[in-house]
């Protein structure tokens, strides 16, 4: 491999395969765009986003790691959310959870 070289797979790479997903419609009620990253606890996303936060508890966007979804003002967007994996502990962010998701 050469430094900086990009090697492509012969077949599409599946990610988050087999994870239980829920679909939600999100409306940005703010006056400017809001972006949410791939591994952000979606229930704690910007308060200008209107959606079922209880259904989003313990979940993140079903998108590739390191990417994000941009929500433009006044435009509803359907998203898929999957469970956060690993230890399922959320600290920081907006402070709504502050620990174990399954406690």
Swiss-Prot record:
Domain of life: Bacteria
EC number: 3.5.1.5
Gene3D superfamilies: Urease, beta subunit (2.10.150.10)
Major localization listed first in the record, in broad terms: cytoplasm
Functional pathway: Nitrogen metabolism; urea degradation; CO(2) and NH(3) from urea (urease route): step 1/1
Record has Cytoplasm as a keyword: yes
Protein name: Urease subunit beta
Catalytic function, reaction form: urea + 2 H2O + H(+) = hydrogencarbonate + 2 NH4(+)
